[in-house]
Each structure stands twice: as structure tokens, then as C-alpha cells.
A protein has these predicted regions:
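Catalytic-domain carbohydrate-binding cleft regions of carbohydrate-active enzymes
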Residues: 1-176
């Protein structure tokens, strides 16, 4: 994530950024988020979610319980869950289990919410968050270099487009 992304997001109407990579081992960051500052001085609230962005079917409640156990000192938290790749969607099974856990949990207030509400709540705490004025790179440099067949086909397609453009120009000059 280049620092230039901040300016693009801010000038596109975003005020916050939720991400999962790079991981803590690669890029240590404050656990409660930070203000990410772009090259031009643009600022957005940023937060790296913990525990990935999904949960296997029937494991969302366990994910919440684990987070609560591992973060007793935190007053505000964000736990993403859903079945499927890249977050997926909520399952009825998980919703029922989470609702049952909410009903019996006396130690914490747990609500179904949105990232936007999380960032609004963070802002409302008026906690001064650290500022980061640099990239969040580098994450998995060259991770797509092993996709040689895809790259070869893409290059072939690019060259075909150049040929079609030349043929169209020649046809136009010939009045065709």
C-alpha cells in the first residue's frame, strides 16, 4: 500500500481505510489504528484488522470469544467474519450463535455493525492516534511473478490489440 493511496482515497471521498496486509511481522502498527498521512498531507483513519476477514462456517462466535480473551484491555474492537473468500457473507448459523453469545455476554457490549460505524466510534473517543507518514509496503513483492502463463497470454492479447489498431488505421486510410 503506497503512501500515495491516502491522497487518492481522501480525494475520492473516503475518510478511513481498513486493511489486513501487511501482517504484523512484516510491518508493526498500532493495534488501535492510526492516522495515515499521504504525500500531499491528506489524512485518513486507518486500521489493520486482526484475525483475517472471514471465519469458517460455525466459527464466528469462537473468533469473537478469542478476540475478547486476547484483548481484555481494549475498549473498542473490530472483528470481521463471514463465510467464503474475501469476507463472504453471513451465515444463518453464525448469526444465531453470535446473537446467543451477545445475549449471555455480560463482560462486553457486542453489536453487529459496520466498518464505518467502527471508525466513527474511534473518532468519537477523541483518542489521539499515532500518525504514519510512509508506505505500508512492502507486502509480497513479486507475488504474481509465478503466473507466467497468464502474463504470456496477456502480452499476446496486447500485441493483438496493436495489430488490430494498425489494421483499422490502414482500412480507414483506404476508405474501407
Amino acid at each position: 500500500h503506497t503512501q500515495g493511496l491516502v491522497q487518492i482515497l481522501k480525494k475520492s471521498g473516503y475518510d478511513s481505510y481498513l486493511f489486513g496486509r501487511p501482517h504484523e511481522e512484516v510491518c508493526p502498527l498500532p493495534p488501535d489504528g492510526f492516522i495515515w498521512v499521504g504525500y500531499d498531507g491528506s489524512e485518513i483513519a486507518a486500521h489493520r484488522f486482526i484475525g483475517w476477514y472471514n471465519a469458517p462456517l460455525g466459527k464466528a462466535r469462537e473468533k469473537i470469544e478469542t478476540w475478547l480473551k486476547d484483548n481484555p484491555e481494549r475498549e473498542l474492537g473490530l472483528i470481521l467474519w463471514g463465510v467464503g473468500n474475501h469476507g463472504g457473507g453471513p451465515s444463518r448459523k453464525d448469526v444465531r450463535e453470535i446473537d446467543a453469545f451477545i445475549a449471555q455476554c455480560n463482560d462486553a457490549e457486542i453489536i453487529h455493525s459496520t466498518p464505518e460505524a467502527y471508525f466513527a466510534e474511534m473518532a468519537a473517543t477523541n483518542t489521539k492516534r499515532p500518525r504514519r507518514e510512509q508506505d505500508l509496503n512492502s507486502w509480497a513483492p513479486g507475488c504474481y511473478t509465478s503466473q507466467i502463463r497468464l502474463k504470456q497470454q496477456h502480452r499476446l492479447l496486447e500485441n493483438m490489440l496493436f495489430m488490430v489498431e494498425k489494421m483499422a488505421a490502414a482500412a480507414t486510410l483506404q476508405g474501407l
